[in-house]
Amino acid sequence: MAGRSVRVPRRGSAGTQSRGQLAAGRDLLAREQEYKRLNEELEAKTADLVRQAEEVIREQQEVRARPFSALTTSCKEEGGSSSRDLLSSEGTHPWTETKPKTKNTGPVNKIQNRLHSADKERKTNSSAKLKYPDAQTANDVAIPDDFSDFSLAKTISRIEGQLDEDGLPECAEDDSFCGVSKDIGTEAQIRFLKAKLHVMQEELDSVVCECSKKEDKIQDLKSKVKNLEEDCVRQQRTVTSQQSQIEKYKNLFEEANKKCDELQQQLSSVERELESKRRLQKQAASSQSATEVRLNRALEEAEKYKVELSKLRQTNKDITNEDHQKIEVLKSENKKLERQKGELMIGFKKQLKLIDILKRQKMHIEAAKMLSFSEEEFMKALEWGSS
């Protein structure tokens, strides 16, 4: 019974530990999928921003390729009053090299607003990504095929080369650059796009570094989980072996009890036989006192009875000696059984102590995990407040 009471809580603790490990593994996988999705969105936003910059250059090249009459009509339609003021201030030669007196900064502001909105979305994704400390990144991120060879330095050099070769038109058809002079539009575009791309490159490098750190942490946690699973398997094996030993000792104890019962039955039968023989002796003594008349005739029979009585006494002595020996043997066996019983009780106590120690170790491990998580969240909250 004691072995069964020990075995049941041990299985429960192993089951709860395995369920906790499975739940932790599922949580890690869900976080990994979430971070992959956020990283894909970030890469898509970056690629979209680069495509927008390339579209601006392409539209400028298309506008430059148009004839002069189409350019003037498009500037008049899109520029409105600002283009008319620019033409009136320059007189009859609106397309000369002289700079206008009033500078139109509307298209530059449009580009800045567009890039600023994209940057806001990207920062929102990166902040949502930093909220979770345990994630797999860097090596497991799915990157689009057209973005594998992306380099901000190459993109900047390509844009600068196109601007140096083609230049900006005096009046472009695009809404973002219409009404801006050639020198101001080129400088503003190059300076703004260059700064924006450098900032994005730095943010991307910081995100990749953070992803690698998180991946190292996840690998450490996986190794810890693996070690815990191996410890659990070893503990289960030891428990099963101890349970088999307990069952074996139980069987031996039952067999010893059966043997003890059999010996007790034999002892009771011998005692009954001895009592019957004693009664016979009493009857013989009474018959001797009653048969004084027949004493002479019964002398021979008395002698015979004496011989038989001596034999019976001898046999009784032998039987009593054997009974004493059997009793001593039974006592020694009972002592052995009591000793085995004491050893079993000591083993049960040791197992209970081992179970308590394992429960405490489990509680310490869980407390250490909770403490580490709380410290990391506190440090991240401090960093977030300072930023």
Swiss-Prot record:
It is found in: Cytoplasm, Cytoskeleton, Microtubule organizing center, Centrosome, Centriolar satellite. GO terms for cellular component: centriolar satellite; cytoplasm. The keyword tRNA-binding does not apply. Residues 70-91, 103-115 have a biased composition (Polar residues). Keywords: Coiled coil, Cytoplasm, Cytoskeleton. The keyword NAD does not apply. Testis-specific. Residues 184-347 form a coiled coil. Residues 1-25, 58-133 are annotated as: Disordered. This is Testis-expressed protein 9. The gene is Tex9.
